[in-house]
Design a protein with these regions (language model features):
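Subset of outer-membrane beta-barrel
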Residues: 18-326
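Cleavable N-terminal export/targeting peptides
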Residues: 1-29
Length: 326
């Protein structure tokens, strides 16, 4: 047990002792926002939670333990400042996973309506132009496979796009051209999961948004590269009897992001008869977020989940997810 927990203890100790603040170091920050409601209720501590298509957004290795032919999930996330994130994931396990699990992920972002302006020789120094609608999109293809009863690996390649409207650029004193502000990037995610024999304790790691530097206009920037290491265990497995119809899952993730100081996510999920679920989480070392709450239910192949995250000076974030597995 000590050899399994030691990496987590070392990582958390490093996080608590870190004083180097990293802020605003990356672009395409929408890739760091998680929309799944189950994960939202558990403070996004999902590195070692496996068996669903949403693993594509956390750790692609999690798909490898899928027991159904396919799993599909749609999530709607009412983010801060009127920004809306919609996510879709699909994973297919042909021939009972003999050939691994194949996955597809989509992430769409609507930044809402913004007022365009342009430089002008008047008292204000600018003129209002037409309104514009910034957006972002990411499409990914993933693969996960269980190499043994305990060890799983997975990866994903994805293409991300961001549209920030257009602007008028003077060419000469009498002529101008319109330029669309569009940028794109190719990124990779990969990870591993290892399941132990000790009460089903699971630990794993993932690397998300690994890519080359991306160019926008004249400046280059990096994507929000994030390294995660985490563990999870059913706390009720320590009770010898009476826990067959219920579970209390505890999960912890330690994050090393390029854009922010190191962070820790803690999550709990209580399940009764694999039908009703209650969730609670805590986000450590975040400026505006702390506790997270969630609930859900599952009837046959259908599951519905909801999560609420208070966001300090902003309105609370609401997420809802609908999943189907067969």
């Amino acid at each position: 047990m000590i050899k399994y927990l030691l990496p987590l203890v070392i990582t958390i100790s490093m996080i608590q002792g870190s004083e180097n603040k990293k802020l605003a170091q990356t672009g395409f920050q929408f890739l760091s926002v998680m929309s799944d409601a189950r994960s939202g209720g558990m403070a996004d501590a999902m590195t070692t939670i496996h068996g669903k298509s949403v693993s594509l957004f956390f750790n692609p290795a999690g798909m490898s333990r899928q027991t159904q032919l396919f799993d599909m999930n749609f999530s709607a996330n009412s983010w801060i400042a009127g920004i809306k994130h919609d996510a879709f994931s699909l994973s297919v396990s042909p021939n009972n996973g003999q050939f691994g699990v194949f996955g597809l992920s989509l992430l769409n972002v609507d930044y809402g309506e913004l007022q365009g302006t342009m430089v002008w020789d008047n008292d204000q120094g600018y003129l209002d132009t037409e309104k514009f609608y910034p957006s972002a999109l990411a499409i990914g293809l993933g693969y996960g496979r269980a190499l043994s009863e305990s060890f799983s690996v997975g990866g994903q390649v994805k293409k991300a796009y961001q549209y920030l409207g257009h602007n008028v650029v003077p060419v000469t004193d009498s002529s101008k051209v319109v330029e669309n502000n569009i940028s794109d990037a190719l990124a990779f995610d990969f990870g591993t999961i290892f399941m132990t024999d000790w009460h089903g304790f699971t630990f794993g790691m993932s690397v998300r948004n690994f890519s080359d530097e991306t160019q926008y206009a004249y400046d280059g920037f990096q994507l929000p590269l994030t390294f995660r290491i985490g563990g999870s265990i059913d706390l009720l497995s320590f009770i010898p009897t009476g826990s067959e119809k219920q579970s209390l899952l505890f999960a912890i993730d330690a994050l090393h992001p390029r854009s922010y100081p190191e962070r820790v996510n803690l999550g709990f999920e209580y399940s009764f008869m694999s039908i009703g679920y209650m969730r609670l989480g805590y986000l450590y070392n975040y400026d505006e977020r702390g506790l997270t709450y969630g609930a859900g239910f599952k009837i046959g192949p259908l599951s519905i989940d909801y999560a609420l995250t208070p966001f300090g000076v902003f309105d609370s974030v609401n997420r809802i997810s609908i999943g189907i597995s067969r």
